[in-house]
């Protein structure tokens, strides 16, 4: 079975180490918040703002936009130098996806780029997705998997990141069920987005399996944002893949009670998981 990249299908043997959750070009200004603390005056976006952004991650809209293909290609060069060969770009509609520019980024960087299909959390869904029934959404996903996305000819390598909030909304449940049905029919993996606000991963996995997905074809994402050993153990024992995929996001979501773990804490999670 070939692996679909933005430059066409490749054999699995041609793909080495792969970063499974990346965003190369995206626009998440939908999440921007009015700052409670103004940024330092006259300081441009860059490392000098790191301390401010750690506490005010969503307060500068420019901070949540990845807009430059040249920068994306340059940063992907680090994948090669680290011994990797591919990345999975999980930016979807409503997140600023720019599919047409990904092939050139892949060529310039020498990195295989694979994309996902599906629908993110409800606030990013267009009306025709938010109100559609499961059958309609399933048909849309099957078309993308088999023919390519939105006339680009680019076929997704998997379904994801399928967005769920906490609690999961009705529209998100329909989206999730559609992804499961499309994945079960085609063999595509489903990669989910879990909210940092709560533990919905076990219920999400149950619904995916109920709709026909094999657990070992399901990736439960962002588990390193919500550290609970029993929660992670339950998902692992059910047969799904655990994604600790938010390394580098050491910041607060607007309050001291909404802090992402540090990378050191994430490494402790990995150490614990390996010991289980």
What are these regions (language model features)?
Residues 17-26, 87, 194-195, 242:
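Histidine-centered catalytic micro-motifs
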Residues 23-67, 117-135, 246, 255:
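Active-site gating loops and adjacent loop-to-helix segments of metal-dependent hydrolytic enzymes
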Residues 46-73, 90-94, 161-169:
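Divalent metal-binding segments
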Residues 74-88:
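Catalytic domains of carbohydrate-active enzymes, especially glycoside hydrolases
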Residues 85-86, 104-108, 112-189, 241, ...:
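Active-site gating/metal-coordination segments in enzymes
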Residues 100-103, 128, 169-174, 197-211, ...:
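Distinct, well-ordered alpha-helical segments
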Residues 189-196, 217-225:
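Catalytic beta/alpha-barrel core
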Residues 226-276:
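Active-site-adjacent C-terminal substructures of enzyme catalytic domains
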